Protein backbone atom coordinates (compact mmCIF):
# COMPACT_ATOMS: atom_id res chain seq x y z
CA UNK A 1 0.00 0.00 0.00
CA UNK A 2 1.32 3.42 -0.96
CA UNK A 3 -0.74 5.96 0.98
CA UNK A 4 -0.10 9.63 0.35
CA UNK A 5 -1.33 11.61 3.34
CA UNK A 6 -2.77 15.01 2.65
CA UNK A 7 -0.75 17.80 4.22
CA UNK A 8 -2.29 21.21 3.60
CA UNK A 9 0.24 23.95 2.96
CA UNK A 10 0.15 26.82 5.42
CA UNK A 11 -1.91 29.72 4.16
CA UNK A 12 -0.33 33.11 3.72
CA UNK A 13 -1.35 35.99 5.97
CA UNK A 14 -4.05 38.18 4.44
CA UNK A 15 -5.95 41.33 5.30
CA UNK A 16 -9.37 42.21 3.95
CA UNK A 17 -10.04 45.94 3.77
CA UNK A 18 -13.55 47.42 3.84
CA UNK A 19 -14.70 51.02 4.33
CA UNK A 20 -15.09 50.34 8.07
CA UNK A 21 -12.44 47.83 9.12
CA UNK A 22 -9.47 45.57 8.42
CA UNK A 23 -10.02 41.85 8.99
CA UNK A 24 -7.04 39.51 9.28
CA UNK A 25 -7.18 35.79 8.53
CA UNK A 26 -6.12 33.11 11.01
CA UNK A 27 -2.50 33.16 9.84
CA UNK A 28 -2.18 36.92 10.37
CA UNK A 29 -4.15 36.72 13.63
CA UNK A 30 -1.34 34.65 15.11
CA UNK A 31 0.66 37.88 15.52
CA UNK A 32 -2.15 39.59 17.44
CA UNK A 33 -2.92 36.81 19.95
CA UNK A 34 -1.42 38.77 22.85
CA UNK A 35 -2.37 42.23 21.59
CA UNK A 36 -4.37 44.46 23.93
CA UNK A 37 -4.55 47.26 21.36
CA UNK A 38 -2.81 48.19 18.11
CA UNK A 39 -1.26 51.20 16.44
CA UNK A 40 -2.09 51.78 12.76
CA UNK A 41 -0.16 53.69 10.14
CA UNK A 42 0.87 53.65 6.51
CA UNK A 43 3.81 54.36 4.22
CA UNK A 44 2.45 55.99 1.06
CA UNK A 45 5.72 55.61 -0.88
CA UNK A 46 5.90 51.86 -0.17
CA UNK A 47 2.16 51.25 -0.59
CA UNK A 48 1.84 49.53 2.78
CA UNK A 49 -0.38 49.70 5.84
CA UNK A 50 1.36 48.98 9.15
CA UNK A 51 -0.35 47.42 12.17
CA UNK A 52 1.69 47.21 15.38
CA UNK A 53 0.34 45.06 18.23
CA UNK A 54 0.61 46.51 21.73
CA UNK A 55 0.70 44.40 24.86
CA UNK A 56 -1.45 45.52 27.77
CA UNK A 57 1.64 46.84 29.56
CA UNK A 58 2.76 48.84 26.52
CA UNK A 59 -0.74 50.21 25.88
CA UNK A 60 -1.19 51.34 29.48
CA UNK A 61 2.35 52.64 30.09
CA UNK A 62 1.30 56.18 29.17
CA UNK A 63 3.94 57.05 26.56
CA UNK A 64 1.60 56.42 23.59
CA UNK A 65 -1.19 58.91 22.94
CA UNK A 66 -4.72 57.59 23.45
CA UNK A 67 -5.55 58.81 19.94
CA UNK A 68 -2.83 56.56 18.51
CA UNK A 69 -4.13 53.31 20.03
CA UNK A 70 -7.01 51.28 18.63
CA UNK A 71 -8.93 48.28 19.87
CA UNK A 72 -8.56 44.95 18.13
CA UNK A 73 -10.99 42.05 18.31
CA UNK A 74 -9.15 38.73 18.31
CA UNK A 75 -11.07 35.49 17.72
CA UNK A 76 -9.81 31.98 17.07
CA UNK A 77 -10.00 32.25 13.27
CA UNK A 78 -9.73 35.99 12.57
CA UNK A 79 -9.02 39.40 14.06
CA UNK A 80 -10.44 42.81 13.22
CA UNK A 81 -9.70 46.49 13.74
CA UNK A 82 -12.66 48.79 13.12
CA UNK A 83 -12.00 52.46 12.40
CA UNK A 84 -13.86 54.26 9.62
CA UNK A 85 -11.65 57.37 9.79
CA UNK A 86 -8.47 55.33 9.26
CA UNK A 87 -10.05 53.37 6.42
CA UNK A 88 -11.21 56.59 4.75
CA UNK A 89 -7.66 57.95 5.03
CA UNK A 90 -6.33 54.74 3.42
CA UNK A 91 -8.82 55.09 0.57
CA UNK A 92 -7.85 58.74 0.04
CA UNK A 93 -4.06 58.30 0.30
CA UNK A 94 -3.89 55.19 -1.90
CA UNK A 95 -6.77 56.14 -4.23
CA UNK A 96 -8.68 52.96 -3.38
CA UNK A 97 -12.39 52.28 -3.64
CA UNK A 98 -13.20 49.66 -1.03
CA UNK A 99 -16.53 47.87 -1.46
CA UNK A 100 -18.53 46.69 1.56
CA UNK A 101 -17.49 43.14 0.66
CA UNK A 102 -13.84 44.19 0.93
CA UNK A 103 -10.62 43.74 -1.00
CA UNK A 104 -8.01 41.20 0.05
CA UNK A 105 -4.26 41.87 0.25
CA UNK A 106 -1.27 39.86 1.39
CA UNK A 107 0.24 40.69 4.77
CA UNK A 108 3.76 40.11 6.08
CA UNK A 109 5.21 40.10 9.58
CA UNK A 110 8.29 42.30 10.06
CA UNK A 111 10.40 40.61 12.76
CA UNK A 112 12.79 43.52 13.16
CA UNK A 113 10.09 46.13 13.79
CA UNK A 114 7.52 43.73 15.27
CA UNK A 115 4.62 44.83 13.12
CA UNK A 116 2.43 43.48 10.34
CA UNK A 117 2.52 45.15 6.94
CA UNK A 118 -0.27 44.95 4.37
CA UNK A 119 0.98 45.15 0.79
CA UNK A 120 -1.42 47.35 -1.20
CA UNK A 121 0.51 47.00 -4.47
CA UNK A 122 -1.42 43.91 -5.53
CA UNK A 123 -4.91 42.75 -4.67
CA UNK A 124 -5.34 39.01 -4.17
Label the model's feature ranges:
Residues 9, 34, 101-103:
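Residues that act as N-cap/strand-start positions at coil-to-secondary-structure junctions
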Residues 1-19:
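Glycine-rich loop/turn
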Residues 20-33, 83-88:
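Short beta-strand-centered segments at strand-helix junctions
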Residues 30-48, 53:
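Acidic (E/D-rich), amphipathic helical modules within compact regulatory domains
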Residues 1-3, 45-124:
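Mature exported/compartmentalized surface modules and terminal targeting/interaction regions
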Residues 13-16, 40-42, 104-109:
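Short, exposed beta-strand/loop patches in secreted or surface proteins that constitute
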